[in-house]
Curated annotation (Swiss-Prot):
It comes from Vibrio vulnificus (strain YJ016). Its EC number is 4.2.1.17, 5.1.2.3, 5.3.3.8, 1.1.1.35. The record marks 119, 139 as: Important for catalytic activity. It comes from the Bacteria. This is Fatty acid oxidation complex subunit alpha.
Amino acid sequence: MIYQAETLQVKEVQDGVAEILFCAQNSVNKLDLATLASLDKALDALTAHSGLKGVMLTSDKEAFIVGADITEFLGLFAKPEEELDQWLQFANSIFNKLEDLPVPTVAVVKGHTLGGGCECVLATDLRIGDKTTSIGLPETKLGIMPGFGGCVRLPRVIGADSAMEIITQGKACRAEEALKIGLLDAVVDSDRLYASALQTLTDAINEKIDWKARRQQKTSALTLSKLEAMMSFTMAKGLVAQVAGPHYPAPMTAVVTIEEGARFARNQALDIERKHFVKLAKSEEAKALVGLFLNDQYIKGIAKKAAKSANKETQRAAVLGAGIMGGGIAYQSALKGVPVIMKDIAQASLDLGMTEASKLLNKQLERGKIDGFKMAGILASITPSLHYAGIDNADIIVEAVVENPKVKAAVLSEVEEQVSEETVLTSNTSTIPINLLAKSLKRPENFCGMHFFNPVHRMPLVEIIRGEHTSDETINRVVAYAAKMGKSPIVVNDCPGFFVNRVLFPYFGGFSMLLRDGADFTQIDKVMERKFGWPMGPAYLLDVVGIDTAHHAQAVMAQGFPERMGKQGRDAIDALFEANKYGQKNGSGFYTYTMDKKGKPKKAFSDEIVPILAPVCAAQQAFDDQTIIQRMMIPMINEVVLCLQEGIIASAQEADMALVYGLGFPPFRGGVFRYLDSVGIANFVAMAQQHVELGAMYQVPQMLIDMAERGQTFYGAQQQGSI
């Protein structure tokens, strides 16, 4: 043994050939701070080892190295710039040391080889993979960019254009593509991977492969003419500006880094990369996006714990109520391996549900995600039925009938008689209290809410609503089932609107009040989309949700929270509803809609809206962007905080993920609680108090006032690592 540490070991595997084996005690290998330090010492040991002819990098896991340890990022990023710069210099000195070994090096690449893992293998001379290999640099998705030499080495290995595509998109390449672009030198069968890599290294040792020339290319300036460079970088900047936009600076910074470093050799180019990385790491966007990644891991951990705690795994499911929503739920269940009965009282609805499932499967087929055989198998695992036959075998029932409490209660009561005492019943409702529906059941402990978002196949969030009598076993089984479906389940306690709709309607309330006071809804949409970063402004979102749906839900919320959400007379939603302007579904709402060539609705402003809104809106007046943002966001933020204060939602992490996954809250802001930490709770309280005359929606919750006085934050040190 040449060197041994907790996460890696170095030994001589044949005459003069040493193997660096990454072998962390965890389920995956990561380039955390400890592993980097061990790799540094391992390379020193190799340098001092006599008779060294070549070095192999291998992993004892299915994935080579999944990347750096993201749980350490926020702690590192919180350090002063000088310390962060020193850490990066240290990390880069390690990869330079690997690249500068006086012998050829080969990486044995399998499974996920991402981020720091990819940057590690880029420092080797040769890279051999198998068909499981997925290699890439996803850092821009976290608001940063490669900082271990990825912006320097990748363009020199595969060319600037391909490198910029991979880095700016945060893309991982499958083995075949990686081979085609030169990121891998060979792809072989898994059982031959080690032997092939060893043979490749032997060929390099025997000078059958010119590894020195390959290394020279990586450590020199990029070979681009002035014209080639101008065309390449100008085009890349244009594409990135169009796709990433102004709220996500990392992709553009990566392009600038590659451009600035192109004319320099490795060490100077690394200095440029380091300078830009530090700037990104200190940004609020990086803090928010890394925070979201950690929050996502947090809710996945909760789901895994629930699955382990559940006494029974869901093997079969049933959906009551077909149509688009029922078909979408059935499709998602079947796609993830849980056969499902889809029951309805109308054949036309069953046909619609099966058509929806077939349509979604055809899209998967067209994209090459599944083959015809698998498609047929998935479709066969959805059983449409007009009767309850076989439903007694279902472990979980998802009721997805019309949003009417009497109809839902009747259907749930009826199906309870058809199933065993262990069967879990759930209701896919967006507004009806779970405690109300539970009154119709003999076994309310086996019942909870399971709120899917539309379209089911795209929206990651599922709200799991705990009723007064819901048992822990029921929650555990439903959370586990939602996770099995590929969803992100978040448990909330019962209240009108649950969590997502409860916090959405004060936002719509702020919108209605702005219109009442003379604001232009098209300006509000532009500000909330372009400045704040929502995917849709409130008027457009209401049209997509459906004015009729929003009108109904608004009444439910007003009844549940009369002080904050009770209406003072008619508003814009009422006016449109009464004029039968329901939004996209009937072609006219705040905007008018026509279908484009692809069959997608395209919105346009029409003067016909003006007389409809006139009775409920003051004469138009100008509002500055900040006033619009404040008046829109304060009610939502206050309601989110109240939900945490009242225990409707358990944690800031779950709330922020629910907002991003369920409502499209701008990811670069990280969710409401991350946003509050970013702007400063005391600053938010002072800002909100300037608008308090607008009504109870603008009244700051006591929790925020107390936290502002104490100088507290929501995330504090709980997501901080240590350097």
